[in-house]
Amino acid sequence: MSDNESDGPTKQSTEPVDNAWSLKIPTFKAEDNPHGLVEESSFATLFPKYREKYLKEVWPLVQQCVAEHHLKAELDLVEGSMVVKTTRKTWDPYIIIKSRDMIKLMARSVPFEQAKRVLQDDIGCDIIKIGNLVHKKEKFVKRRQRLIGPNGATLKSIELLTDCYVLVQGNTVSALGPYKGLQQVRDIVLETMNNVHPIYNIKALMIKRELMKDPKLANEDWSRFLPKFKNKNISKRKQPKNKKPKKEYTPFPPAQPESKIDKQLATGEYFLNKEQKQAKKQQERSVKQAEAAKKQDERRNKDFVPPTEDAPSQSRKRPAETSKVDVDALKAKLMKANKKNRS
């Protein structure tokens, strides 16, 4: 690989690099591979029926785009497949892999205007399969919708923070953008399908973006600034109201329950004749009737039992001093009232 003269010579350094993402990838030129490719390579991918109309409309643009890199593209509407091939003029050995990714993205409903960006050197793609991460369909639909958010707000915020184009389609999530952003998108998608809300990862990315602006914190640990969320999911399994104690294990089988004949043998009723059995039943019946009559009499006589009265308390009696009346004061009061009436 070599650079243009305008780019200047590359510095070959063996020293460790602090930020590998900041390194500029040298561009691959036609002069680096003057002999071209030895063999023809081709990749094909199938597309669903509902993409046929769109692909038919944009296919001339696809052919024009790959022709700039000396590739050939074919669309088979009968088989439902897209094919990209190298030609004798193709000099970039990796461009066929990039074009394969482009047709894969287009098959996953990514528009051509976005899919053609993957042909650039600093742009990659990632198709994340999420269909087998959740067993129940209801949970899968709910978590996939959580990734999109209301009116696509969550998906838009992920795109802004990672500088990637993200599309949720069926059982896959297609991401297109710089390689660092693709790692972040994959982490967010996988954690969302594992029941971690994407807003937590979005908040962490926003904090990291602000911390990057401060050069003093470049070599420090950022974990103290990032929010820590605890899982508050409580087991929703209902416990039984009355728990039965577990019986002690015994190697012997349980005892056979007593039959009616066994009970009669234990009480001696089995050996009684018919008349004796009837006499015994009559005796038991008369005992029960006597007990019921006794309870009924007690219930009837309950209304005629006089209630218990409390003894008169001594505190209610007024002392002898309070019963005395001042006669002189009463006479004076009456005379005063008579004078007022006369006047």
Swiss-Prot record:
GO terms for cellular component: nucleolus; nucleoplasm; small-subunit processome. Residues 272-341 form a coiled coil. This is KRR1 small subunit processome component homolog. Residues 230-343 are annotated as: Disordered. It comes from Drosophila virilis. Required for 40S ribosome biogenesis. Involved in nucleolar processing of pre-18S ribosomal RNA and ribosome assembly. Binds to RNA. Required for female germline development, cell viability during eye development and for survival of dividing cells and epithelial cells during early wing disk development. Belongs to the KRR1 family. Residues 126-194 form the KH domain. Its main location: nucleus.
